[in-house]
């Protein structure tokens, strides 16, 4: 069950980072380049390490759908896309609230594409 806790923790970190970006995007927090960089770095790092947290035998006890193990290459490619898109954001860091909003649309679409297929509904 260690894998389940680890991957859920990583996913919560990504969620927290998306929340930090959303607060800037919505104008609830002022634009802060360091906060944006930190949030997107967490998303990039965790997305790249994420597929390793799903070894055979860790299929139960979480919101991870069995489809992950049935279509592992697709799952890995979706995680890789999130990591690559986060790296693109880091390479050209958004300079203002509008840039953060645009970055969130891309990253959020990546999150949704994976969750739709690979996360069980609660």
Swiss-Prot record:
Give Gene Ontology CC terms.
Answer: periplasmic space
Give UniProt keywords alphabetically. Electron transport, Heme, Iron, Metal-binding, Transport
Show the InterPro entries listed in the entry. Cyt_c/b562, Cyt_c_II, Cyt_c_prime, Cyt_c_prime_subgr
Q: Say yes or no: keyword Transport present.
A: yes
PTMs?
A: Binds 1 heme c group covalently per subunit.
GO BP, one annotated term: electron transport chain
Q: Which residues bind heme c?
A: 11, 111, 114-115
An example molecular function term from Gene Ontology annotations? iron ion binding
Pfam name, any one: Cytochrom_C_2
Q: Where does heme bind?
A: 11, 111, 114-115
Quaternary state and partners of this protein? Monomer.
Q: What does this protein do?
A: Low-spin monoheme cytochrome c.
In Swiss-Prot or TrEMBL terms, this protein is called Cytochrome c-556
**Organism whose genome encodes this protein:** Agrobacterium tumefaciens (strain II Chrys)
Where is the organism placed in the taxonomic lineage, from the top? Bacteria, Pseudomonadati, Pseudomonadota, Alphaproteobacteria, Hyphomicrobiales
């Amino acid at each position: 069950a260690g894998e389940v806790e680890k991957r859920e923790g990583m996913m919560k970190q990504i969620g927290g980072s998306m929340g930090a970006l959303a607060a800037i995007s919505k104008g609830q927090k002022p634009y802060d380049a360091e906060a944006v960089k930190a949030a997107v770095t967490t998303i990039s790092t965790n997305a790249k390490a994420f597929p390793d947290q799903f070894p055979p035998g860790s299929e139960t006890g979480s919101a991870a759908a069995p489809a992950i193990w049935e279509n592992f290459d697709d799952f890995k490619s979706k995680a890789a896309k999130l990591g690559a898109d986060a790296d693109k954001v880091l390479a050209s860091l958004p300079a203002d609230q509008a840039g953060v909003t645009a970055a969130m649309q891309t990253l959020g679409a990546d999150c949704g594409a994976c969750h739709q297929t690979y996360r069980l509904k609660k």
